[in-house]
């Protein structure tokens, strides 16, 4: 079980809602993934209408919604968007995203920390998307964020855990859940993240753009479960030298 703030999740796989060919495919993929927490870009839905083509099926599916501030370029814009989402959706949960450069979509660390401090004071459960910076993640944790969401690689790049060395430090020092977000391109990337100690992963593009999103969602579900189970089983230590699995000379001595 994974606990973040006031909610508990059985699934360690969070999913997004962007890039799907149709809302029906999105909902079917989310169900196949087993995900219980789904991010929702506020700029893509009509928050005033709960019969919105994206919002309505998500509400019907019974998943927890995590509105995000994607599109915000400053702390002020993010805080404004967060307040709108809370009023419209009735949730104080928020994925904080601030990326001023549309080409790279890298999170702005200064504006993110500034917004996080303000939103925590307003009672939001803040899950900030951030760079894989151990110092920043610790500062966000100290500011009161309920979890941290460092990137594995740039959003939508499918490059995998390019920031692995920094992620390991973040995981080791964190006292809040660590959710690896962005860059996860195939199920094995998700399994690796859970194996190394991440509490969850957030996957969107890899599922949404697959030839068969529903089957890919199911594959990610299995990979996350496998990665978590492997970590709980206690993997053997890595070694720079070969380690024999059976005696090398015993049978020769027996023949002497």
From Swiss-Prot:
It holds the Pfam family ThiG. The keyword ATP-binding does not apply. It comes from the Bacteria. Keywords: Cytoplasm, Schiff base, Thiamine biosynthesis, Transferase. Homotetramer. Forms heterodimers with either ThiH or ThiS. Belongs to the ThiG family. This is Thiazole synthase. It comes from Klebsiella pneumoniae (strain 342). The gene is thiG.
